[in-house]
Every structure is written in structure tokens, then in C-alpha cells.
Amino acid sequence: MTSVQICIAAAALTAVASFPPVARGQAGSRMNEVTTAEAKAGWVSLFDGKTLNGWNVIGGVRWTVVDGALSAEPASQPIAPTGDSKQTWPQGFLRSAANFSNFEMTAEFWSAEDTNSGLFIRCAQPANPGSLGGCYEINISDPHATTPTGGIVGVHSPLPYRVKSAGKWSRFDVLADGPHLVVKVNGETLTDVRDEKLKDGAIGMQAGGPTGSGPIKFRNIKIRPLKRN
């Protein structure tokens, strides 16, 4: 291992080690809030647990807050195909009002086996968070053939897949530090890559898509902006 590789590995370990502990929804766990220690370390909450404040709704999916979580209900039926088009499902997004460049981020999510969702970072096209050329999409789809949960669509596929996230509350830990991108799911690193394409943009969350529509919920969405030397 070269000295440069050692420095990169050490920086990644330091960043991941600074993620806040898991809030398990028990009494006194302060769901959707940053603790005093987290605030001193620079963490802020992107979701207040009560409203959609700080988020813009895009597309044809209804988002609500249920039991302290951002919730998108699955569509009851797909969109009927027209002409040569294929059958698709209604798709919608939440997009953060603020942009972020370099950061650590955590988010808990609940998905089903048929859920088609994703967590988007550095969305350079604010009107279209689903644009694969304008966002890094951290996929949420355990059975996806090429990019299961924790992979970045078009960048990295975590195969063979070794983490089951569906049917329970799971957690993303994300590092975006310059070109260095790290994604953990429930504490296990599934993506650790370098990619130069996108440097800044909004955070996005997806519900529904071309291949299916299942329930998705998000909570405890926290971010810590990083300063690069």
C-alpha cells in the first residue's frame, strides 16, 4: 500500500467512525433530533419529524409524515402504457432546499421487497433528482439484478449482495468527500469508490419507478458538512 493509499484509508476510517450512534426509537432516544454532542461536532437534522419543511415535492407520489417518518405510499396500479411505451409506475421525489458538497450523512429507511427507491446525493439538476446523469443514486432495492441496496447506480455494484435491508428499519452511513464516496448499510461497507463527475447538489429521496412501487419511509436524516483542505 502506498503512502497516498494509507492516508486515504485513514481518512475514511476517521470519517466513518464519527457517524452518530443509531437511534432505535426507544424512550429518550431523541428521534429525528441531533444530540448536544452531535451538534458540537457539526451535525444538523434535515427532517424535523413533523413536517416537510426544508423539502420540495417533485413528481406524482404523495409524501406524508407518519409516526415521525417521511412516508410515501405505494401506487395502487401502474401507469397504463401508450403506444410503444412500457408499463411504468408513478414516481416521485423529495428534494432538499439546500445543496451540499462534502459531507457525512446518516439516514434510516424502511423498505419492502418490492420497493423501488433511492437516496440521491449531489443532485446537480434540481428539477429532476431522478436524472442518472445529474445525481449519485444510492439504490434501495435488495433484489436489483445489478445495483442492489447500498450500490451507486452507474458507479458501483455491491455484488455478490450480502446485506438484507428490506422489511425492517435499516441505516445508511454516507461519506462524500471530494471524489471519495463511501456507503455503509447497517454498518457494513458496500461501496467505497472514487468518482469525479459530481461535486455539489441537493439531497433527494425517491418513491416508485419504472420497475415497481412499494412502500418507503425515511427518518433520522442527519448531515455534517465537511471542509476540504
Regions found by a protein language model. Give the residues of each.
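N-terminal compositionally biased, intrinsically disordered segments and leader/signal-like regions
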Residues: 3-4, 15, 36
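Carbohydrate-interacting regions of secretory-pathway proteins
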Residues: 19-229
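Bacterial N-terminal signal peptides that target proteins for export
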Residues: 1-9
